[in-house]
Amino acid sequence: MLERLRNLVLETLPEEGRIENPMPCLALTRFNGPQKNRQCFHHPMMALVLGGEKESLIGGRPVVYGAGEAVVVALDLPGAYQIRNASPEHPFLSLSIRLDRAIITELLTEAPELRPAPNGRDAQESVSVERLPDDILNALVRYLEAMHSPRRAAVLGPMILKEIHYLLLEGPQGRVLADVCSEAAPGSRILTAVRWLREHFDEPLDIATISERTAMAPSTFHRQFRAVTSLSPVQYQKRLRLHEAQRLMLVESLGVEAAARRVGYESCSQFSREYKRLFGDAPARDIREKTVGASDAGKCACVMEA
């Protein structure tokens, strides 16, 4: 089934590039050469490598996964990755499914046995690498095959997508996926904090306010947040600001100072230092290099990875 998936991606992407939403929540990626220090922001997703190997830093956790292995991410997390060995003859290939919390919540209502036990345990780390079982691979094959038939895509697509979510909930990472979508569970409280940070990243960080919103003491909130994301709240906010600033410069053509102030920096020099520390180059030079001669896949990947 892995070979069938690989062939389906090659048929859809005969050249280097990235396709978003050929089916709902689906993205396909092909790189024909190495990629270094690509910064991205991960939505909740399952990403399966079909050719090559990917080295990623997701949140604060390093992960390496190759052909036949998948990474499952339960929360919105900043990240970076590189691909060492890829060529036109042996391209890096991957597919990803963006996880839909509405589907997960619906499944937890229909199958309450998948809900986490309300025992007050700590939140779980939100990233895992695993080999997908045959039933998920089979569902992915059927989902990609449905791309080629508008009728099947419309009728069978939603059912197969829901099936993929259900099978993931049954798997090793299902407990964490259920945790972040179950009201009052520790993971759900951290999800509340992540959403607040994403909506208010340009404001001064107020741990007391976030702790109150998550119904946790500040010390408990810090511990749980780091357990789930492998980052402190301050580190998470900084990554949000820098990724959004890069997007503003790359997509909306804002200047360095305007982007820095838009995301909450009062000091442009501090912004430039922290930007270079994360992205490896000064803001203006980094954006210039990304907009001149970059592939479509590279341009997309430096902003968002779903």
Task: Pin down the residues of each PLM region.
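Amphipathic alpha-helical segments enriched in hydrophobic/aromatic residues interleaved with Lys/Arg
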Residues: 5, 104-163, 167, 179, ...
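A short, N-terminal "cap"/entry segment at the start of jelly-roll beta-barrel domains
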Residues: 1-22, 26-29, 35-36, 120-125, ...
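Short, amphipathic alpha-helix enriched in basic
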Residues: 192-203, 230, 244-251
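Residue at a beta-strand N-cap/secondary-structure junction
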Residues: 55, 204, 253-254
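Basic/polar phosphate-binding segments, predominantly the helix-turn-helix DNA-binding elements
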Residues: 163, 167-173, 180-182, 186, ...
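…primarily DNA-binding HTH/wHTH and HhH modules…
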Residues: 247, 251, 255, 262-306
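N-terminal regulatory/effector-sensing and dimerization cores
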Residues: 18-117
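Short, structured loop/turn "capping" segments at alpha-beta junctions
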Residues: 118, 154, 172-176, 189, ...
